[in-house]
Curated annotation (Swiss-Prot):
Top-level taxonomic group: Eukaryota
Upper classification of the organism: Eukaryota, Metazoa, Chordata, Craniata, Vertebrata
Subcellular location: Secreted
EC number(s) reported in the record: 3.1.1.4
Swiss-Prot/TrEMBL catalytic activity: a 1,2-diacyl-sn-glycero-3-phosphocholine + H2O = a 1-acyl-sn-glycero-3-phosphocholine + a fatty acid + H(+)
KW Ligase (keyword) present: no
Disulfides per UniProt: 26-114, 28-45, 44-95, 50-121, 51-88, 58-82, 76-86
Protein name: Basic phospholipase A2 BmjeTX-II
CC terms in the record's Gene Ontology section: extracellular region
A Pfam family per the record: Phospholip_A2_1
Coiled-coil portions: none
Amino acid sequence: DLWQWGQMILKETGKIPFSYYGAYGCYCGWGGRGGKPKAGTDRCCYVHDCCYGKLTSCPKTDDRYSYSRLDLTIVCGEDDPCKELCECDKKIAVCFRENLGTYNKKYRYHLKSCKKADKPC
């Protein structure tokens, strides 16, 4: 669910996810806006959108799943029916951490060059 997703991102990046990533680039934020992702951070959101689109179980973003942290690693519950959803959220949290250096404030609330046509997954 959104709270769990937010907690993963906060623990990985130290950033408050909804204010930091909520309206960033072409893909970060509810639903994405399409076009070419803006650098690494926005690419994380693009990949996350694609991951959600490929879910075969628990396709809803409000479904809860089990996960823990082992040392500094996110571990999704092995037998959880929503493990795929957890793995998508884990990937974006780790991607955001790995791409903290690509975050550019000029892409906050950036809609100008976002096209309607999505880049195919």
